[in-house]
Amino acid sequence: MKIALTERFQSDVRALGAEERAAVFEALLALPRSIGAPHLHAGLGMRKIHRTGIWEARVGLGLRLVFAFADDTLTLVRVGDHDEVRRFLRGL
């Protein structure tokens, strides 16, 4: 599986504190093996959130990871709190 990072995702990660970055990294390690395995992705709270194939996963209590999955490529789109993710989705 390939992993692609958008510029916006990279910018979001740079804006996080050290603890939040570590939590994002842990979620990223779990994400590829959790796709297609409901019993594994339950802990990440993965769910499809947009009809265009955008998904969300929890990173701790306050952060959400937004990604797309197609053609064996996981594209990391955004990371932010619930409100930031909602604003992003309104723009789609």
Regions found by a protein language model. Name each.
Residues 24, 28, 39, 43-46, ...:
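Residue-level detector of alpha-helical recognition elements and their boundaries
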Residues 2-3, 47:
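Residues that recognize and position ribonucleotide moieties
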Residues 2, 8-15, 21-22, 58-92:
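Enriched for short, Lys/Arg-rich terminal
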Residues 30-58:
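A short, surface-exposed loop/turn module that caps and links secondary-structure elements
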